[in-house]
From Swiss-Prot:
Ligand binding (a divalent metal cation 1): 172, 192, 233
Chain sites annotated for binding Zn(2+): 112, 115, 130, 133
Keywords, ordered alphabetically: Hydrolase, Magnesium, Manganese, Metal-binding, NAD, Zinc
Name of protein: NAD-capped RNA hydrolase NudC
Residue ranges of domain Nudix hydrolase in the record: 139-262
Organism field: Pseudomonas fluorescens (strain Pf0-1)
UniProt motif (Nudix box) ranges: 173-194
Gene of this entry: nudC
Entry EC no(s): 3.6.1.-, 3.6.1.22
Protein family according to the UniProt entry: Belongs to the Nudix hydrolase family. NudC subfamily.
Ligand binding (substrate): 82, 125, 138, 206-213, 255
Catalytic activity: a 5'-end NAD(+)-phospho-ribonucleoside in mRNA + H2O = a 5'-end phospho-adenosine-phospho-ribonucleoside in mRNA + beta-nicotinamide D-ribonucleotide + 2 H(+); NAD(+) + H2O = beta-nicotinamide D-ribonucleotide + AMP + 2 H(+); NADH + H2O = reduced beta-nicotinamide D-ribonucleotide + AMP + 2 H(+)
């Protein structure tokens, strides 16, 4: 099946196309959505920090206008990326997720981290360049392992103090330098709840642009230990029966997918599809 959305490095000197606008408050939208005629959008009273050509949607070029600040546009409002994730149009969310990552990266790499000189966008390449240092900086992607630990009809779920009240989720953490995905998973589970795991199975991945994570999802079986929550990181962790689960993460998340797949398998139901 052909994807409606493909990323690309587009020449911002070319006219036309569609554009999305991102400010500190999120993305601009109106009754027709988040895509605006590019030339019209650039004529509005917007504090444009930078423009990036980011790809093609249904064959049409799409650009990002990254803004210094939030501006009022008649008939329009601003909405955060997480809200778009929950809205249901997964293709538009993928466009905005990519735009958010490119905008964040470019904003954070306006100046060279080595010498402090201003960096410039490299033509036809997704990179920022410092000429005095001959240094290129590329978009950051942070690999994070996320795992559902299981024990028969039970699943191990935990909650962070940062979670929505009452919601429990799977365990997760970022990979350290020199660490394999499996080593990271084992370490994170041990650190967060002092549980040992075995029979690790890769389940899929999901881009998580908050701001630049790549979530690698796994199932793992309980191998031993008693739950001891990591101080300041895990507020509570429990074994839950698949027939009696607490409030769970949003259905579009890979955390929810990992849980739903295991529950479906235990109950003999059809397995869900991993959201993009």
């Amino acid at each position: 099946m052909t994807s409606r959305w493909t990323t690309a490095v587009l020449d911002t000197d070319q006219p036309g196309g569609w554009a999305v606008a991102r400010s500190p408050e999120g993305f601009l939208f109106d009754d027709n959505g988040v895509l605006f005629p590019r030339e019209w959008l650039k004529r509005q009273d917007l504090s444009i920090l930078a423009e990036h050509g980011i790809g093609h949607l249904d064959g049409e070029p799409v650009y990002l206008l990254e803004l210094h600040s939030t501006s009022e546009v008649p008939g329009c409002n601003w909405k955060g990326l997480r809200a778009f994730m929950l809205d249901g149009d997964h293709t538009i969310y993928k466009v905005l997720g990519y735009a958010a990552q490119i905008g964040t990266w470019a904003r954070e790499h306006r100046f060279c981290g080595n010498c402090g000189q201003a960096m410039t966008q490299v033509p036809r390449e997704r990179a920022m360049y410092c000429q005095p240092c001959d240094l290129r900086s590329y978009p950051r992607i942070s690999p994070s392992m996320i795992v559902l630990v299981t024990r028969g009809d039970e699943v191990l779920l935990a909650r962070s103090p940062r979670f929505v009240t009452g919601v429990y989720s799977t365990l997760a953490g970022f990979a350290e330098p020199g660490e394999s995905a499996e080593d990271c998973l084992i370490r994170e589970v041990r650190e967060e709840v002092q549980i040992e795991v075995k029979n690790i199975q890769y389940m899929g991945s999901q881009c998580w642009p908050f701001p630049h994570s790549m979530m690698l999802g796994f199932h793992a079986e309980y191998a031993g230990g008693e739950i001891v929550c990591q101080e300041d990181e895990i507020e509570d962790a429990q074994w839950f029966n698949v027939h009696d689960l607490p409030p769970l993460p949003a259905s579009k998340s890979i955390a929810r997918y990992l849980i739903d797949v295991y529950v479906a398998r235990r109950l003999g139901h059809a397995e869900p599809v991993l959201p993009g």
